[in-house]
Amino acid sequence: MTREITIGSVKIGGDRPLVLIAGPCVIENEAATLRCAERLMTICNGVSVSLVFKASYDKANRTSVTSFRGPGMQEGLRILQKVKDSLGIPVISDIHSIEQVKPAAEVLDIIQVPAFLCRQTDLVVEVGRTNRVVNVKKGQFMAPWDMENVVGKILSTGNERIILTERGVTFGYNNLVSDMRSLPIMRRIGFPVVFDATHSVQLPGGQGGSSGGQREFVEYLSRAAVATGIDGIFMEVHEDPEKALCDGPNSVKLDDLPALLKKLKAIDAIVK
């Protein structure tokens, strides 16, 4: 069993029910972000699933230099603070440099370390020092047991509020696969484990100037992951994925989320 972590009104880990971390890939604008957060809260309240709202203020690793990156840190954090204040739900976003850590910690309930940066010791340690909950995405290039070393870096700061997220493993060019063994392996480290169901179906750089995705497989991988007994599910969602400014091909349409959550909640209840 993993340790239980409290994030505002949300508890994850231990024998707690499945938690949803969800939101748009990137903050497109304030109105759309608030609209998405409100819709997610309504959906989650309807199926009794705890929610952490996710949105990035800067997508620093987009495929092309011309790709939309977001509003930037200052404006993005302001919008996320407004989500917290107006809806009372915890928020998570990702940082990309040491300089971003302190201002991000003033707003975010969970600071996320991107998969590509999970081995950057100075960055990981700096995030740990905030004593905020830290969500580390396992690099697409890493074995699940190697995440114990990443956890050790955070623990060295005295911070024990750690979440690990699986988001697929590189499989040749422009492709990812999900090894479900990684979920119980990482849970043995002792901290809550989340499955990123939408980035796991991403086709990195698969459209030349942007990444592709296979949204049709999100439900299948989600069901399989929840059946292993994970603590949370991570999904990027959008009201109209075809018009999303980032990661539309692998994002879940908000209209499709309630039915999927009901299935995942039922599976979670069986395995816990």
Curated annotation (Swiss-Prot):
Top EC class for this record: transferase
For this UniProt entry, the molecular function terms from Gene Ontology, in alphabetical order, are:
3-deoxy-8-phosphooctulonate synthase activity
User: What does the record give as its pathway?
Assistant: Carbohydrate biosynthesis; 3-deoxy-D-manno-octulosonate biosynthesis; 3-deoxy-D-manno-octulosonate from D-ribulose 5-phosphate: step 2/3; Bacterial outer membrane biogenesis; lipopolysaccharide biosynthesis
Which InterPro entries does the protein's record reference? Aldolase_TIM (IPR013785), DAHP1/KDSA (IPR006218), KDO8P_synthase (IPR006269)
Gene Ontology biological process terms, A to Z: keto-3-deoxy-D-manno-octulosonic acid biosynthetic process
Cellular location(s): Cytoplasm
| Enzyme Commission no | 2.5.1.55
Q: Which UniProt keywords apply?
A: Cytoplasm, Lipopolysaccharide biosynthesis, Transferase
Keyword match Nucleus = no
Q: Which Gene3D superfamilies match?
A: Aldolase class I
Reaction(s) catalysed by this chain, per the record, are: D-arabinose 5-phosphate + phosphoenolpyruvate + H2O = 3-deoxy-alpha-D-manno-2-octulosonate-8-phosphate + phosphate
Question: For this UniProt entry, what's an example GO CC term?
Answer: cytosol
Does the record bear Transferase in its keywords? Answer: yes
- Primary place of residence? cytoplasm
State the similarity comment.
Belongs to the KdsA family.
Question: PANTHER family recorded for this chain?
Answer: PHOSPHO-2-DEHYDRO-3-DEOXYHEPTONATE ALDOLASE
Q: What is this protein called?
A: 2-dehydro-3-deoxyphosphooctonate aldolase
Instruction: State the organism named in the record.
Output: Geobacter sulfurreducens (strain ATCC 51573 / DSM 12127 / PCA)
Q: What is the lineage of its organism?
A: Bacteria, Pseudomonadati, Thermodesulfobacteriota, Desulfuromonadia, Geobacterales
